[in-house]
Amino acid sequence: MLKSIRTAEIILSALPYIQKFRDEIFVIKYGGAAQIDEKLKNNFARDIVLLQLVGIKAVIVHGGGKKINSFLERLNLKSEFIDGLRVTDKDAMEVVEMTLSGLINKEITSLLNKHGARAIGISGKDDNMLKAKSLDDGKYGFVGEITDVNENVILTIINDGLIPVIAPIAIGSEYETYNINADLCASAIASKLKARKVIFLSDIKGVLDKDEKLISKLNETSINELKNNGAISGGMIPKIDACLECIKSGVGAAHIIDGKIPHSLLLEIFTDEGIGSVIK
C-alpha cells in the first residue's frame, strides 16, 4: 500500500508541469549513448510516448556520429573534426546521408512506433524543409549552415498527431546535399517553431565548470566566461552556441542533459530540480 501511495504522489508531482506544457512544442536533439545502448533507446522511446500522451508536441532531431564513424572506417574513409564539426567531403557525404536518413532515422521511427507512438521519419531534404549553404566558405567540405526552415512541413506533421523524426540533412541552392550538425539543426528548427523548449541529450551531465561541477542555470554572460576560461571547448562549443541562438530567437529555454541517465528526459521536464543545465 505504501508503495502504491508513493507511486501516486510521484505521478501527481508532475501534474503542474503537464498542465503548463500541454500543447507546447519541444524540440529534442537525440544523440550520444542514449542512441546506442539498447536499454536507453527503449527508455527514450517510452519517454517520448508519455510526452505525446500528456499533450506535449515533440519534434526529434537525431545525430548519428558513432555509426557514421563506423561506416566510414569500413569504407576506409577518414574522419576529421575541426571546431567540433565533422569535415565532410563528397564521398563522406554519401555515407553520412545514407547512415542518417536511410538507417538511423528509420530505426528511431520504428522503435517509437513499436512503443505506441505515432512517428514519421523524414530528411531535411524532403519538401525542401531544410535549406542550407556551405559553412565558412567550404572549410568543412559539405557541412552546411541552415539558411531557412520550412516550418509548415513540420507543423503539418504535428497537427496530424504525429511525431516528426528529422535527419539533419539539408539541400543547397543548386540542390547539393549538406551535412548539418545535429545540435545546430535542432536549434534552427526550435527557433523557427518558437518552441517552448529545446533539449539536447548528450553524454555529459550538462555544462560543467573547470572543476567539472555541474552548472544548473546559465545565461549568455556566464557562458562567455566559461568559454574564456576554457571550461567550454571542443565539441561543446557548437552545442552551447546552438542553445544561445535558440534563446535569442525566442525559444523559452534550452536544456543540456545526460542521456546516459535512464528517463533523463522525464526527470528534466517533470521535476523541480531537473538533472542537467538550463540556459535562459
Swiss-Prot record:
It comes from the Bacteria. The keyword Cell inner membrane does not apply. It catalyses: N-acetyl-L-glutamate + ATP = N-acetyl-L-glutamyl 5-phosphate + ADP. Its EC number is 2.7.2.8. The keyword S-adenosyl-L-methionine does not apply. It is found in: Cytoplasm. This is Acetylglutamate kinase.
